[in-house]
Amino acid sequence: MSPKAAARVTSERQKVLALDTNIFIYHFEENPAYAAFTEELFDKIESGRVRAVTSALTLHEILTGARKAGNPELASLYRNLLGSFPNLHFVAFDVTVADISSDLRARYGLRTPDAIQVATAIHQRAEAFVTNDEGLRRVKEIKVTVPPAAG
């Protein structure tokens, strides 16, 4: 098999995970209950063993948190880090995600941000949506994975 063909097969088999905002926050804050999980997850993403997608809403929520805390330098650091993180793709809110998210919101009574995040995962054909929100397990259109807490 040629190197080009091998690369194509490898990329076709690459696992795609969608990440909720809380996974990033736990990682940045080094939350002891989830530090081992997020460290391993982001190592896999950075090395290319896993490809990650998340809604642009994630960036909005992370930057808002830093700015509300009065820390524009931290917001800038997060923006630069996330914008250049390998194998992480931010997905814009578009009409397709709007359609899917409105259906999820109506069907499951999800809050709008949760519906947008899950709709983004579905639209991107992610294998799973990784979140710490147990309530999202009721969504049947995608596998919802909640990381185990240490301790």
Model-inferred region functions:
Residues 28-30, 122, 141:
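Short, function-defining helix-loop hinge/capping sites that tune catalysis or transport
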Residues 47-49, 84-85, 125, 139:
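Structured helix-beta-strand junction loops
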Residues 2-6, 12, 39, 88-134:
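Active-site neighborhoods of divalent-metal-dependent phosphate/nucleic-acid chemistry enzymes
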Residues 24-25, 59, 98:
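A short, flexible beta-alpha/helix-coil linker loop
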Residues 1-54, 67-76, 80, 134, ...:
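Short, well-structured N-terminal submotif of metal-dependent ribonuclease cores
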